[in-house]
């Protein structure tokens, strides 16, 4: 089963308040988007002007206002400030309310969101965070069967736990990966795979996509059944100066992976990001005022095997972006699929 090309909208919870974020997702459906995903942050990456509405409340509100959008997190960490059993219950409920439209995008987590909510001790190294992710996914899937679940893991346990309302179609789990280790796990166990753009094409062609295929092969799975999602960071505007300047709010994306995973305070994150020159900030983004040029840059990811393109626009005028995307980019992109 070959996955079809899908175009999605990234709802920037770090940038917009809850009501505006809901209305933008409703507008995204009207402009033909196939999905809308939202980040799950307790704290934003930017203290001044930042936002952090609760992802699951947003998903439910958007679900009530839309008819066909696939809705999900990109991504949620079901392992520290959350109990994975409760997350399983929440997603099961949404799956019953909006059948076939809900997905859970899951990752290993960042200190920014977990330390503030009570995690004590030294922030865990990758090995523990990865182990927690795998264990939480297994527990949630056990609970989604609707059967009584006695689970005894290294980090989580349940005794006689049942989720009484589970959707017949299940809840697909998308695994977010920035390197081959977790990408292999996505291939073994994920219904979908999530990565982000702007890190050099070699990462996708030589590491991530081969790792997904390797994991699927070892698990005797058909890799074409896995929805391969990428958040494409794109600043498209017919005004080239606006296209460049719009990236500034998202300067934290240009910090190193180590900085993003270890910084605990949005004020500290903002200070580190604002010290970066605009040229460095813009490197993470496709910055373009020409639709053919923008599509040519996006096409690299399609050619690498990614089929679900979720577009993250950095500017504050998201309505303008959605209008321009619908007019200039979507027809060209769908012609590629």
From Swiss-Prot:
Its EC number is 1.1.98.2. GO terms for biological process: carbohydrate metabolic process. It catalyses: oxidized coenzyme F420-(gamma-L-Glu)(n) + D-glucose 6-phosphate + H(+) = 6-phospho-D-glucono-1,5-lactone + reduced coenzyme F420-(gamma-L-Glu)(n). Substrate binds at residues 196, 199, 260, 284. Keywords: Carbohydrate metabolism, Oxidoreductase, Plasmid. The active site is at 41 (proton donor), 110 (proton acceptor). One of its GO terms (molecular function) is oxidoreductase activity, acting on paired donors, with incorporation or reduction of molecular oxygen. The keyword Cell inner membrane does not apply. InterPro entries: F420-dep_G6P_DH, F420-G6PD/mer, F420_G6P_DH-rel, Luciferase-like_dom, Luciferase-like_sf. CDD domains: Tetrahydromethanopterin_reductase (cd01097). Coenzyme F420-(gamma-Glu)n binds at residues 40, 77, 108-109, 113, 178-179, 181-182. Catalyzes the coenzyme F420-dependent oxidation of glucose 6-phosphate (G6P) to 6-phosphogluconolactone. Belongs to the F420-dependent glucose-6-phosphate dehydrogenase family. PANTHER family: 5,10-METHYLENETETRAHYDROMETHANOPTERIN REDUCTASE, PTHR43244. NCBIfam families: F420_G6P_DH, F420_G6P_family. Homodimer. This is F420-dependent glucose-6-phosphate dehydrogenase 2. The lineage of its organism: Bacteria, Bacillati, Actinomycetota, Actinomycetes, Mycobacteriales.
């Amino acid at each position: 089963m070959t996955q079809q090309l899908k175009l999605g909208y990234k709802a920037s919870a770090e940038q917009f308040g809850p009501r505006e974020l809901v209305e933008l997702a409703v507008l995204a459906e009207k402009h033909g988007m196939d999905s809308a995903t939202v980040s799950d942050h307790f704290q934003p990456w930017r203290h001044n002007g930042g936002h952090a509405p609760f992802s699951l409340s947003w998903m439910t509100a958007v679900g009530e206002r839309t008819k066909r959008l696939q809705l999900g997190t990109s991504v949620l960490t079901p392992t520290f400030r959350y109990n994975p059993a409760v997350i399983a219950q929440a997603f099961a409920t949404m799956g019953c309310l909006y059948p076939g439209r809900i997905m859970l995008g899951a990752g290993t987590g960042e200190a920014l969101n977990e330390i503030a909510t009570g995690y004590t001790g030294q922030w865990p190294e990758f090995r523990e965070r990865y182990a927690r992710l795998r264990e939480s996914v297994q527990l949630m899937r056990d609970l989604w069967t609707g059967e009584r679940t006695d689970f005894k893991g290294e980090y989580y346990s349940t005794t006689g736990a049942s989720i009484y309302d589970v959707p017949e179609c299940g809840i697909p789990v998308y695994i977010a990966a920035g390197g081959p280790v977790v990408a292999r796990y996505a291939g073994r166990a994920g219904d979908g795979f999530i990565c982000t753009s702007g890190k050099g094409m070699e990462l996708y062609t030589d590491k991530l996509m081969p790792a997904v295929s390797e994991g699927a092969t070892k698990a005797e799975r058909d890799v074409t059944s896995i929805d391969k999602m990428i958040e494409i960071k794109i600043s498209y505007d017919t005004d080239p100066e606006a296209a460049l300047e719009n990236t500034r709010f998202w300067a934290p994306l240009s910090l190193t992976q180590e900085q993003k995973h270890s910084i605990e305070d949005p004020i500290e994150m903002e200070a580190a990001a604002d010290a970066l020159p605009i040229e460095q900030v813009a490197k993470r983004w496709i910055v373009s005022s020409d639709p053919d040029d923008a599509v040519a840059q996006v096409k690299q990811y399609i050619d690498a095997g990614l089929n679900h393109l979720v577009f993250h626009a950095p500017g504050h005028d998201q309505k303008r972006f959605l209008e321009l995307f619908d007019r200039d980019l979507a027809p060209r992109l769908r012609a590629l699929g």
